[in-house]
Structure formats: C-alpha cells, structure tokens
Amino acid sequence: MSDDEGQFAEGGAQVGSLTYPMQAGALKKGGYICINGRPCKVIDLSVSKTGKHGHAKVSIVALDIFTGNKMEDQAPSTHNVEVPFVKTATYSVLDIQEDREDPSKPAHLSLMDDEGETRDNLDMPPNAELAGQIKEQFDAGKDVLVVVVSAMGIDQILSFKNAAER
C-alpha cells in the first residue's frame, strides 16, 4: 500500500478523516458542508438550471457551526463537496476551574458522560453570554448538562440545560 492511500475501517469510512465526499446535488437543508475549511450547517440551497456547459449549479448558504458566521458557496451538482463528520455529546459539569494567574483566560471544565468517563480538556465556550449562564447555573448548585459538538478536530460547548429539564 502506498503512503498516500488512506487506512479504511469496516464500511469504507476512512480512519482519522475529518470529512467525507458527497455530491453537491445530494446536500439537504439542515445537513453539513465544509466551506473554506470550516464545518457549516446548510440553511438554504438553490439549484440553477442546467446551463450550456451541462451542469446544474448548487448555491449553498450555511452557518459556521462554531462561530455562527454566514458563508456561501457554489458547486456543480455532480461534483463532490466535503462534508464534515459532526458528533454531538452531552456531559455533566463536575467542576469549573478559573485561571487564578490570568483571569482573561476562559475557565476550564471537568465533565462526565453517561458512562462515567471524565473529560478535562474543554474550556468555557467563547460566547460570553453562554459561558456566564453555565457558570451562574453551576454556582447556584444546579446539575448542569453541556452539549459538546465535535467537528474538524474542534470540540466546543454550544448549549446547556439543567439536568432536571432532561
């Protein structure tokens, strides 16, 4: 096997790959796409008629799933586009540690999943309002659950809820 051939797992999925190819014409509203190397959620799709050069074009409007920035792209409907693998997981917040030396750094979270596995490699979300709400609920003694979205090698907390609301 040559160096540039990928390692494939059962079912043909490439091990360690952050994206997979999909025909632009097969994209759906609410699905995902990579635009400029960023994972995005498709919010609008439109297909133009087949032109004199033979391909219908798909116009895509999407939001970056981590920043919320609006992004646009176009591709011939028969060409492949990159689609990110997106995983969502819910964790219980065990502890929030502030950086005492540098308060400008985001607080660090200790989390636990449903199987009891702990995770200590996530910071508070960059969205100050969301981070403040999580800290406020945790400091009030409530059981806080955070929703972590993972895509393109990035893990980020995008929302939270109280365990009682489950």
Swiss-Prot record:
Region (Disordered): 99-125
Entry-linked SUPFAM superfamilies: Nucleic acid-binding proteins, Translation proteins SH3-like domain
Chief localization: cytoplasm
A GO biological process held by the record: regulation of cell projection assembly
Inactivation phenotype: RNAi-mediated knockdown at the bloodstream life cycle stage causes a growth arrest followed by death. Cells become abnormally round, the number of cells with 1N1K and 2N2K genetic content is decreased whereas the number of cells with more than 2N2K genetic content is increased. RNAi-mediated knockdown at the insect procyclic life cycle stage causes a growth arrest without cell death. Cells become abnormally round and about 40 percent have lost their flagella.
Gene Ontology annotations for the cellular component aspect, listed alphabetically: cytoplasm
Domain of life: Eukaryota
GO molecular function: ribosome binding; RNA binding; translation elongation factor activity
Subcellular location, record wording: Cytoplasm
PTM description: Lys-52 undergoes hypusination, a unique post-translational modification that consists in the addition of a butylamino group from spermidine to lysine side chain, leading to the formation of the unusual amino acid hypusine. eIF-5As are the only known proteins to undergo this modification, which is essential for their function. Hypusination is mediated by the consecutive action of deoxyhypusine synthase DHSc and deoxyhypusine hydroxylase DOHH.
This protein's UniProt keywords: Cytoplasm, Elongation factor, Hypusine, Protein biosynthesis, RNA-binding
Modified-residue entries (Hypusine), positions: K52
Function: Translation factor that promotes translation elongation and termination, particularly upon ribosome stalling at specific amino acid sequence contexts. Binds between the exit (E) and peptidyl (P) site of the ribosome and promotes rescue of stalled ribosome: specifically required for efficient translation of polyproline-containing peptides as well as other motifs that stall the ribosome. Acts as a ribosome quality control (RQC) cofactor by joining the RQC complex to facilitate peptidyl transfer during CAT tailing step.
Family of the protein in this entry: Belongs to the eIF-5A family.
Protein name per UniProt: Eukaryotic translation initiation factor 5A
Lineage start: Eukaryota, Discoba, Euglenozoa, Kinetoplastea, Metakinetoplastina
